[in-house]
């Protein structure tokens, strides 16, 4: 069966590295395929981004479906008030204690609650990782500004202190999911609730629409996509993505620069 004949499938799509490249160039060929598929299927963007910085891609695709933000910590439907919003947060007290106990090695940090952005300070280190457009920015000491639990948090440190911060955060691994990563010599520890994942969000959306998991497809390139790619029927990793998901995903497709998503649908027999 060709992709044009697909009907009542849930198709989950990561944004960065899947439909846009590292320079934010949009894969228009894949966008057009997704637009065509959205006529008879549920297209769900599944991203670590907040809503405000994924909204443009939701609108570009002209979607009428739920969206997964913060890697599953916030799931909502911008056009359907009957869809029950799902928000999972991290314990504020653990986050504040982590910051206090490691204040000598932390360079900067931020956390978000929907589109409220709590930031320790603005500097060149953090600028590439935050989207101020549409955000309600709250600056300063989190002990004074943060009044409730957040969707997640990102903490910046030096290379020499990276392992120390990871090891400390792992003391709370029963409550907090830790994702350490490095990007262009920036060392980051990302924190989420242990109960969040893109996979869990996808299964909840399948239940809402009464879609069998045999009718699920997902595309992604990062380690945060692994659970999503392994919970669906057709999990597709983008070439050039994280080595672990390339090993574990059932299918691979060319990179976003080579219009991998579009090529998969055009060449695959379902």
Where are these predicted regions, by residue range?
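Non-catalytic pre-domain segments flanking phosphatase-related domains
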Residues: 1-13, 32, 36
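Short active-site oxyanion
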Residues: 40-44, 63-65, 151-152, 214-215, ...
